Design a protein with these regions (language model features):
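Membrane-embedded alpha-helical segments that form the functional core of polytopic membrane enzymes
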Residues: 28-76, 111-112, 123-134, 169-190
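Juxtamembrane boundary at the C-terminal end of a transmembrane helix
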Residues: 289-301
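Short, membrane-interfacial amphipathic segments enriched in basic
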Residues: 1-9
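Transmembrane helix-loop-helix
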Residues: 49-58, 102-143, 218-278
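Select subsegments of transmembrane alpha-helices in polytopic membrane proteins
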Residues: 19-27, 96-105, 146-151, 214-224, ...
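Small-residue-rich segments of transmembrane alpha-helices in multi-pass membrane proteins
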Residues: 26-34, 91, 149-166, 208-213, ...
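Intramembrane alpha-helical segments
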Residues: 8, 14-17, 88-170, 175
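Solvent-exposed interhelical
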Residues: 61-112, 180-238
Length: 301
């Protein structure tokens, strides 16, 4: 058990672990890169976008709402995480449940206040998003398949806020979003396989617990093949510059992923597959820069 009086630094590290600060930093980077190189109008330069006050407030509100979402999710999953993630849970518990809940409400309050400086619609949007995250943590995640789809949808919504702000509804953005959404659903299902022991012990009705590992693997396989649809569309119908190398490389990785998925049986093997999917997502964020190298140079000048 954590010490009775952990230092302030330990509590900060614990809170950073609870809110998964590393994930939030990647999301912030992804929102800004997508804004600069995909979503924002071409006439806006990189500096104009980077120092756009309303965009900054939207990204900040997104980060706070996501952080609060991780907190409430951690609160509801505390028992099964003792089995599934004992080391992380040990670190997380340097902050009490009471402090976590207080932080959850404070972050949500600040998020809504920040949104109010953008527009009333932003307040409605983020209020609905906060409620949706709570609903997912409290109810939806306990429903096989629907829980996985809900988690992936909630992960994509912050990007929706950005392209609504810039009023850019080009088809290419939705195709990119569909690819990301499918990979996120796959990742959620792999997490269920990875956490099978703890979920089973807590009678948590995930897809592998309810219908078995083979059914979960079959569902993941179908989703992997579905990811090839947006990839083909992006390669054939749109100009995505050197990012086509990313999608070709990702397709190869997903084929290898499928092979290892069907021979995997242990938690460590599923964790390796989970990390491979994380790599695909984070690498994809960085490869946004490859869509148009000329635009990258122009926007950064």
């Amino acid at each position: 058990m954590p010490s009775q009086n952990p230092s302030f630094l330990l509590k900060l590290v614990s809170l950073f672990s609870v809110v998964r600060g590393y994930n939030i930093l990647v999301i912030i980077l992804a929102q800004y890169l997508a804004s600069i190189f995909i979503i924002a109008p071409d006439h806006l330069g990189g500096k104009e976008i980077l120092f756009n006050q309303n965009l900054f407030l939207i990204v900040l509100a997104s980060a706070l709402s996501i952080a609060s979402g991780y907190i409430i999710n951690n609160f509801y999953d505390s028992e099964k995480d003792l089995i599934n993630r004992p080391n992380k849970t040990y670190i997380d518990n340097y902050v009490s449940q009471k402090t976590k809940l207080a932080t959850y409400f404070v972050l949500n309050f600040i998020c809504v206040i920040i949104a109010s400086y953008v527009a009333f619609q932003a307040v409605v949007f983020f209020s609905a998003y906060i409620f949706a995250i709570w609903l997912y943590s409290h109810k939806l995640k306990k429903i096989p398949i629907l829980g996985n789809i809900s988690a992936a949808t909630l992960a994509v919504i912050p990007f929706f806020a950005v392209f609504v702000y810039f009023r850019n509804f080009d088809l290419v953005i939705f195709v990119h979003a569909m690819f990301l959404f499918l990979v996120l659903v796959i990742r959620e299902l792999v997490k269920d396989l990875e956490n099978l022991r703890g979920d089973f012990a807590q009678d948590y009705p995930t897809l592998p617990v309810t219908y078995g590992e083979q059914t979960a693997k079959l569902a993941i396989s179908v989703l992997v093949f579905l990811t090839f649809v947006p990839v083909v569309i992006l390669l054939q119908k749109f100009e995505i510059g050197y990012m086509d190398f990313y999608f070709v490389f990702t397709t190869i990785l997903l084929v290898l992923f499928l092979y290892f998925l069907w021979i995997s049986k242990s938690k460590s093997q599923y964790l390796w597959l989970h990390n491979l999917l994380k790599f695909i997502i984070v690498f994809g964020v960085l490869c946004i820069l490859l869509i148009d190298v000329d635009v990258v140079i122009k926007k950064l000048i």
